[in-house]
Amino acid sequence: MTSGSPKITNLLTRVKRIIPPLLDTFHKGQAGRVGVFGGCQHYTGAPYYSSMSSMLFGSDQSHIFCEKEAANVIKSYSPDLIVHPFLREKDKAGPEDSVDKCFELIKPMMGRLHAIVIGPGLGRDEWMQEIMAKVIEYARKNDMPMVIDADGLWLIQQRPELVSGYHNVILTPNVIEFKRLCDKLDIKSDGPDACNQLAGKLNLLIIQKGQSDIISDGATAYACSVPGGLKRCGGQGDILTGILATFLAWRHAYLSKEWDTEGNMDAKECLFLAAFGASACTRWCSRLAFKECGRATQSTDLVRHVGKAYNALMEDEIPSVEEKIKD
């Protein structure tokens, strides 16, 4: 943890408060409807990892909005996925297609979602990026929680004003993406206070992924040092986005008081707790998969352990969690 920040187990105790109970009075979708925006001809796995992880962690539904040519491939991964082929790459668009028409297909769905993820498998095609800019603008206007990762961060690097000052978004850069964002804003990326500086300059929350994940809004910073696995396979960041989106959907339910909630945490505190909970559970998921598979670990192995990671850190009693983390 960073100096002066709470113990891991104290934070996890608070994280648990935003998790909705499993009640027979709840209806389908009340425990979270997540939207994942990404998936193109070359990248179909990333949106699957994000969407599937969100459901395996506990959201009721997850929708994938992807490029038309990626849709059937993504659908084939699981019948649990809801796939909308509403995105278009510029060189594959027909004469009837346009950025505005694509967004008009998406817009009616947005009101059904509690949290969205932008970036997994998105690519950098001009149209795909422009459509996402419209999605971000709409989400911000309607105060929707957002997670932005991967090539969604490429868009933010080009147009930081899309999210600057927005209180309901979390950026999740890896080391390369973090450096690009810092370079854009004239911040030394390898400085000891770089995450605080970047978060402060953008005036939003960042999870800087690394040996320990640094979570900062520019004023307060926590370090999540829950031990993870040692295999750095592609796709782990996508799993983080899905778990994080589920936490943000639960945060929405908590703040809406959809059950008799414990305590009276505000939106800002819940945002921090969602970020910390997602980081901790993703890292523990990686640890479980690595323990089983070792050097052969792939992100498909992590997906199989998402539910186990939830049970280990969110369902077990804190003393046993504390012992697990020490092991």
UniProtKB/Swiss-Prot annotation:
GO biological process: one example: nicotinamide nucleotide metabolic process
Primary location = cytoplasm
| UniProt enzyme class | lyase
- Which terms does the record give in the GO molecular function aspect? ATP binding; ATP-dependent NAD(P)H-hydrate dehydratase activity
Binding sites annotated in the UniProt record for (6S)-NADPHX: G121, N174, V175, I176, E177, F178, K179, R180, D238
Q: Which reaction does it catalyse?
A: (6S)-NADHX + ATP = ADP + phosphate + NADH + H(+); (6S)-NADPHX + ATP = ADP + phosphate + NADPH + H(+)
Report the Pfam families cross-referenced here: Carb_kinase (PF01256)
* Official protein name in the record: ATP-dependent (S)-NAD(P)H-hydrate dehydratase
* Natural source organism: Schizosaccharomyces pombe (strain 972 / ATCC 24843)
